[in-house]
Amino acid sequence: LMDEKNGLKFTLERDCGLKVGDLAEVVGFPNLSGPSPVLQQCLARAIGRQPLPPSSPLEPGKLISPDHDSTVVHVEGLLVGLSQQKNETILELQAGVHTFAARLESRNPSSPLSVPIGARLQLTGVYHGIGGNRAEGRALDSFELLLRSPTSIVILARPPWWTLERLLIALGSLMTILVLVLIWTSLLSRKVTQRTAQ
């Protein structure tokens, strides 16, 4: 649930058919024990439709903040890991000194997400703070992004072609060629020496 700037998590008592973009009234019991307040055992109803508020940028130095919790944000990062689990794809990204996960529900597990490791990405999703307790003054431990669809992932730059693995293969190939050339010249030198001795 989100207004212009703030977000709030809530758990429904029963499904009420809310969809993304619905304007809703929500009533529930507050729980203040986590990184941000959560309404539990909620009853909700849609009272209209409204465009989603624009995403706000996450700055590299201010990634972990309870102020972002449950809001739509966008962040740039370097893809360092990609794994497919039962019903979701998990992207592991690095932004500055922080590493975080982005989760994308897999609607079609037979066609996995194909994003190359090392690519620079921009992700847009809902910020989900992990750990911490605002009431006790404990800071967030980390966060993850909950992505809506594959369109929430934009590839800003592909990884460089010269990776460490490719560089080592090229150096190994050159060393092998150099050794073969040295062996061939040594054999040729012996033959020339034998012929001149005759």
Regions from the PLM with identified roles:
Residues 1-165, 169:
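OB-fold single-stranded nucleic acid-binding module
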Residues 126, 195-198:
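Charged/polar helix/coil "stalk" or linker segments at domain boundaries
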Residues 159-196:
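Alpha-helical transmembrane signal-anchor helices
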